[in-house]
Swiss-Prot record:
It comes from Burkholderia vietnamiensis (strain G4 / LMG 22486). Mg(2+) binds at N272, D281. The keyword Membrane does not apply. Belongs to the SELO family. Keywords: ATP-binding, Magnesium, Manganese, Metal-binding, Nucleotide-binding, Nucleotidyltransferase, Transferase. This is Protein nucleotidyltransferase YdiU. Its cofactor is Mg(2+); Mn(2+). The lineage of its organism: Bacteria, Pseudomonadati, Pseudomonadota, Betaproteobacteria, Burkholderiales.
């Protein structure tokens, strides 16, 4: 059954959409079998209303932008029944395990997320739609299965902001709110965010079947991921080793992009790592304001495990966990000697792959930093120059986003134009010393100041989702004013443009922003 993208009347569209969601392809995750998921209806969300809607994501899914005006739109994406769902087509929650804060946590799973199906995208790919906050599942443990308005708005906005920064990420179609109260650190109201991704398979899915000694199911999962998302691995000498390497390289690239924009994920547990190398699970994230290499965005992270500077190391560690989970599959097709010999060879092969992480991450970050500095030519000491800037920023707590954006205004020959960026530094002499090194390096470039500035402004965003901007939108949304959610979403879709009418959104955070805290409570 197919969804008609040309339907002119939203009233005709919604039933077709529900039917299409209920009819996944034969190679969908849900087709792997009951050992991978549990089907169950979402918990009804009373009196739902639309808080935010991305027409851009709707178009990606082949849906008309007018869809949000449908009377039953909020009902469907709140998880409320809009039709009689047969048992074989109910939403499902998947099971996985994982390491949380470096400690084996055992079985986890979608404790409040329900996948309602998949839709064909306008780009030729297929996308799963998942309701985060859809109610309790068999994997909820002590949770209530709900998400709150605060965290749902943050995830909705950041998913789209990251996409427009060019960073691999899940997307967000809509946020649906309700006045239903839920208890967190205080009483809040419920919401559901519809997440969109080609797949929600995590490192933790592989860890689950490894830890339960189910190599048959582990192989079924790996074959699914290879067939659908990494087809080139099929032709490799060892497809499962190739899968490890492909996922690891994507992860390294993703984290390099995080570092380049000052993004902190906040909770890089293995169950929050996508096998596709996309950013997933926006919880206690944050963009660094006053730069601190040791910045911790999650106040639940008392040890600083997931601090900004630690993210590359943790990503690498997580890849080790993925490698361990894949060991029973690596080398299977070679049939090398007995099981002990094969296992020993698998460990050696996996170690060789894992050694490539820094080889991938380092150059990826260097390329990003070279672009941020407007350096077109490659020179031996460029990485050192970038690191010296970061150290100078760290010492002065200079704003990360504004420093790189304003650096474009610096002239090769005229230090009098340094003021906009220089004023961000407490230690002006330290900045001047670095700026002299930078000018010397710029003298080797062929581009003039204007061309360099234009190039820098294409990679250094002016607008990012700072915590205080999200907080203002959340506070207004609690009063049923969703205009700031929409305004902020529109601004963040053009992060590199000047947008002079929105200049306050690019300013330094106000003093009150320093008291904001985000945690795993969502």
């Amino acid at each position: 059954m197919s969804f008609s993208r040309s339907a002119a009347d939203p009233a005709d569209t919604l039933p077709d959409l529900a039917a299409t969601l209920a009819a996944p392809g034969d190679d969908a995750f849900v087709a792997l079998g009951d050992a991978f998921h549990t089907r169950l209806p979402a918990a009804p969300l009373p009196a739902p209303y639309v808080v935010g809607f991305s027409a851009e994501v709707a178009q990606l899914l082949g849906l008309p932008p007018s869809l949000a005006a449908h009377a039953q739109f909020a009902e469907l994406f709140a998880g409320n029944p809009t039709r009689d769902w047969p048992a074989h087509a109910l939403p499902y929650a998947s099971v996985y395990s994982g390491h949380q804060f470096g400690v084996w946590a055992g079985q986890l799973g979608d404790g409040r997320a329900l996948t309602i199906g998949e839709l064909p995208g306008s780009d030729g790919r297929r996308y799963e739609l998942q309701l985060k906050g859809g109610g309790r599942t068999p994997y909820s443990r002590m949770g209530d299965g709900r998400a709150v308005l605060r965290s749902s708005i943050r995830e909705y906005l950041c998913s789209e902001a990251m996409h427009h920064l060019g960073i691999p990420t899940t997307r967000a179609l809509t946020v649906i709110g309700s006045d239903q109260p839920v208890v967190r650190e205080e009483i809040e109201t419920s919401a559901v965010v519809t997440r969109v991704s080609e797949s929600f398979v995590r490192f933790g899915h592989f860890e689950h079947f490894f830890s339960n000694d189910r190599p048959d199911l582990l192989r079924r999962l790996a074959d699914h991921v290879i067939e659908r998302f990494y087809p080139a691995c099929r032709e490799a000498d060892d497809p499962y080793l190739a899968l490890l390497e492909a996922a690891m390289l994507r992860t390294a690239d993703m984290v390099a992009q995080w570092q380049a924009v000052g993004f902190c994920h906040g909770v890089m547990n293995t169950d929050n790592m996508s096998i596709l190398g996309v950013t997933i699970d926006y919880g206690p994230f944050g963009f660094v304001d006053a730069f601190d290499a040791n910045h911790i965005c999650n106040h639940s992270d008392t040890s600083g495990r997931y601090a900004y500077r630690m993210q590359p190391r943790i990503a690498h560690w997580n890849c080790y966990c993925l490698a361990q989970a894949l060991l029973p599959l690596i080398g299977l097709q070679h049939g090398i000697g007995d099981d002990d010999a094969r296992a020993e060879r698998a460990v050696d092969d996996a170690q060789a792959v894992l050694a490539k992480f820094p080889e991938r991450f380092g150059p990826a970050l260097e390329r990003a930093m070279r672009a941020k500095l407007g350096l077109e030519l490659e020179r031996e000491h460029d990485a050192e120059l970038a690191n010296q800037l970061l150290e100078t920023m760290h010492a002065s707590h200079a704003d990360f986003t504004l420093t790189f954006r304003r650096l474009a205004q610096l002239s090769k020959h005229d230090a009098s134009r340094d003021a906009p960026v220089r004023d961000l530094f407490i230690d002006r002499a330290a900045f001047d010393a670095w700026a002299n090194l930078y000018r010397a390096r710029l003298s080797e470039e062929t581009r003039d100041d204007a061309a360099r500035a234009a190039a820098m402004n294409r990679v250094n965003p002016k607008y990012v989702l700072r915590n205080h901007l999200a907080e203002v939108a959340i506070r207004r949304a609690k009063d049923k004013d969703f205009s700031e959610v929409e305004r902020l979403a529109q601004i963040l879709r053009r992060p590199f443009d000047e947008q002079p009418e929105h200049e306050p959104y690019a300013a330094l955070p106000p003093d009150w922003a320093g008291s904001l805290e985000v945690s795993c409570s969502s």
